[in-house]
Structure formats: C-alpha cells, structure tokens
C-alpha cells in the first residue's frame, strides 16, 4: 500500500440542529473543528414522517413561493 496518499482522518465535533454535539471521525476540517448542520435526521421530513417543516436558511423557499405564487400550488 502506498504511504501518504490518504487524507488525514481525525475527530471533529458535529453540532446538530437541536444544539447537541456529537464527536465523529472525518476528513473534513482539522482536529477539533466544529461542523454546524442546517438539517439533520431529527429535523428532516424524510426521517420524521413529514411532520417537521424545512428551514428556509437561504431564502430559497421564499424565493420559489414568490416566483410561482400565481399558479395556486
């Protein structure tokens, strides 16, 4: 096996939407960095049975609704 071809695999903190922090191994960022999620399994309609609403973090849902408001969806 070739040496030094694989990315660094280290521990990071993943902050869920409810504020809980989970320690995971990843190639993202550096050791000890924190990745904040916009949506996770506890808040995603695919895993909650559609009971939860999607968060409009970037204004995309609002922009879509405004663009197609006259069609009566």
Curated annotation (Swiss-Prot):
Subunit and interaction comment: Part of the 50S ribosomal subunit.
GO molecular function: rRNA binding; structural constituent of ribosome
Keywords assigned: Ribonucleoprotein, Ribosomal protein, RNA-binding, rRNA-binding
InterPro entries per record: Ribosomal_bL28/bL31-like_sf (IPR034704), Ribosomal_bL31 (IPR002150), Ribosomal_bL31_A (IPR027491), Ribosomal_bL31_sf (IPR042105)
Annotated function: Binds the 23S rRNA.
Organism: Ruegeria sp. (strain TM1040)
A Pfam family reported for this protein in Swiss-Prot or TrEMBL: Ribosomal_L31
NCBIfam families: L31 (TIGR00105), PRK00528.1 (NF001809)
Protein's UniProt name: Large ribosomal subunit protein bL31
Organism domain of life: Bacteria
Gene Ontology cellular-component terms listed: ribonucleoprotein complex; ribosome
GO biological process, alphabetically ordered: translation
Family classification: Belongs to the bacterial ribosomal protein bL31 family. Type A subfamily.
Record lineage: Bacteria, Pseudomonadati, Pseudomonadota, Alphaproteobacteria, Rhodobacterales
């Amino acid at each position: 096996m070739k040496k030094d071809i694989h990315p660094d695999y280290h521990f990071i903190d993943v902050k869920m939407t409810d504020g809980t922090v989970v320690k995971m191994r990843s190639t993202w960022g550096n050791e000890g960095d924190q990745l904040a999620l916009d949506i996770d399994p506890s808040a995603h309609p695919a895993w909650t049975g559609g009971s939860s609403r999607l968060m409009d973090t970037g204004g995309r849902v609002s922009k879509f609704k405004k663009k197609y408001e006259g069609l009566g969806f």
